[in-house]
């Protein structure tokens, strides 16, 4: 009857954020196929591919054609906010839609009595604005730094996997560039 949207992000948001995190660690000029990304996260490739295409349409990732093609970030990790990824996957529509039910039923008043916005709608709008501000303030680079501090072993494993996936040798330091800074070395 009513088009009510629950403020809940789809699983594609999680998948897309993790994919961006991994793509941020790629050596310069490298890309990962949707199949490689799906393998890394043990996700169904067709569904992940759909989300990667949405990220490309939003200008967050770039599709690299050819047999060695795949996806890479279209911008630096510091320029990609979590909100941009969320909106690329789930859209930017407001999570709450007031239908003004206060103006219906036996206690409703004449239209002119409703000079102020609905208090519930106002509270929900403030909450959503705060949520959006927080997501806009955090970038993929911020996530990379946090993961490096909180889970250095996972970052090391990811670096090694990436180096193998793109044909570099991590023991010889061939990953270079953003990969080394995006996934910090192990430390306590």
Model-predicted regions and their roles:
Residues 19-26, 88:
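Short amphipathic alpha-helical elements of helix-turn-helix/winged-helix folds
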Residues 1-7, 188:
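Short, intrinsically disordered or compositionally biased N-terminal tails of bacterial proteins
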Residues 42-61:
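Canonical helix-turn-helix DNA-binding module
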Residues 31-42:
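A short alpha-helical element within helix-turn-helix/winged-helix DNA-binding domains
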